[in-house]
UniProtKB/Swiss-Prot annotation:
CDD domains: Ferrochelatase_C, Ferrochelatase_N. It comes from Pseudomonas fluorescens (strain Pf0-1). It catalyses: heme b + 2 H(+) = protoporphyrin IX + Fe(2+). This is Ferrochelatase. Its EC number is 4.98.1.1. It is found in: Cytoplasm. One of its GO terms (cellular component) is cytoplasm. It comes from the Bacteria. Belongs to the ferrochelatase family.
């Protein structure tokens, strides 16, 4: 029996659309120091304030996009897991969520108990960020350390510029981009600017000029989420043969009053509508599975906002989800994952 297991990890979801389940999920998510990178007392106070109203608001949003089978993110991730079982021939393929269930700890313990001493951990995030990639890796390391697991852990690296990922993205999006449209907006998840500046290895590059991300050195690019997003967008546009002016980049899901990376998706939708754009396509390449940020934030609220600003039609291009070419690409990428523990 082969013993090289694969553990796919996505963000997670509330167990249901009930306010109690959403509150529990948001508390776990927002109390992660890699998500809100403030000292514990400040973070606890801030999250407590957020949890006064946000759970009810978010529960309503989740209910508007919830499927009969459950959370779209979890359902689509499980479908990808099934696709991966045919692509990953070295051992079992399990699925974990960083927040909620099934947890990273539960799955690591399950795999080790079954005799698998080599596991590839696959954070399903194309671009690197502490709040996504790092927190998954650190949680896995915590489990290995605290449970004293005898296991070799390899970790899938960010794949924002890898040909396999880009080719799958192009193949998935092409049918949608063959229709008539005025503009393509590539909307990535946003982050507070401080999440980027604190990782700048030079200490004097991030946000020092408008083209800092375009001119990032290899050392800066390795940990700069915004630069990686722009690189993904540019490589995608190049592969699709999109002319300048036909596409642009924005960042969504801003939370709180801190300065986040720009341009903001909400502002960009208004600008495009008021500039005469009538039909817009929106892709969300930071997500490999459709979720509340794509289906509700863009597909529902973004569509309404665009129309109110003067646009006529917003079409959300689906994420990679369980696309067979994406599953094949992911298996290839995981084959190259370097040893971490």
């Amino acid at each position: 029996m082969t013993d090289h297991a694969l553990l796919l990890v996505n963000l997670g979801s509330p167990a249901s659309t009930s306010v109690a389940d959403v509150r529990r999920y948001l508390n776990q998510f927002l109390m992660d120091p890699y998500v809100i990178d403030l000292p514990w007392p400040v973070r606890r106070l801030l999250v407590s304030l957020i949890l006064i109203k946000r759970p009810e608001q978010s529960a309503h949003a989740y209910a508007s996009i919830w499927w009969d089978e459950g959370s779209p993110l979890v359902v689509l991730s499980r479908r990808l897991q099934q696709q991966m079982k045919a692509q990953w021939t070295h051992g079992p393929v399990e699925l974990a969520m960083r927040y909620g269930e099934p947890s990273i700890e539960t799955n690591l313990l399950k795999l080790v108990a079954a005799g698998h001493k080599r596991i590839t951990l696959a954070p399903l995030y194309p671009q690197f960020a502490d709040s996504t990639t790092t927190t998954v890796i650190e949680e896995a390391k915590r489990v290995v350390r605290e449970k004293k697991l005898d296991v070799q852990l390899s970790v899938l690296q960010p794949f924002y510029d890898q040909p396999e990922y880009l080719d799958a993205l192009v193949a998935s999006a092409r049918p949608h981009l063959q229709q008539d449209y005025d503009h393509l907006l590539l909307s990535f998840h946003g982050l507070p600017e401080r999440h980027l500046t604190k990782l700048d290895p030079t200490g004097n590059h991030c946000f020092k000029n408008e083209d800092c991300c375009k001119n990032a050195s290899a050392a800066v690019l390795a940990t700069c989420y915004r630069a990686q997003c722009l690189r993904t967008a540019a490589l995608f546009a190049e592969r699709m043969g999109l002319p300048d002016g036909k596409w642009s980049v924005s960042f969504q899901s801003r939370l709180g009053r801190a300065k986040w990376i720009e341009p903001y998706t909400e502002a960009r939708l208004d600008e495009l509508a008021k500039s005469g754009v009538k039909k817009i396509l929106v892709m969300c390449p930071a997500f490999v599975a459709d979720c509340i940020e794509t289906l509700e934030e863009i597909g529902d609220r973004g569509k309404e906002q665009f129309r109110e600003a003067g646009g006529e039609e917003l079409v959300l291009v689906p994420c990679l989800n369980d696309d067979p070419q994406w599953a094949k690409a992911l298996a290839t990428l995981c084959e190259r994952a370097p040893l971490a523990l």
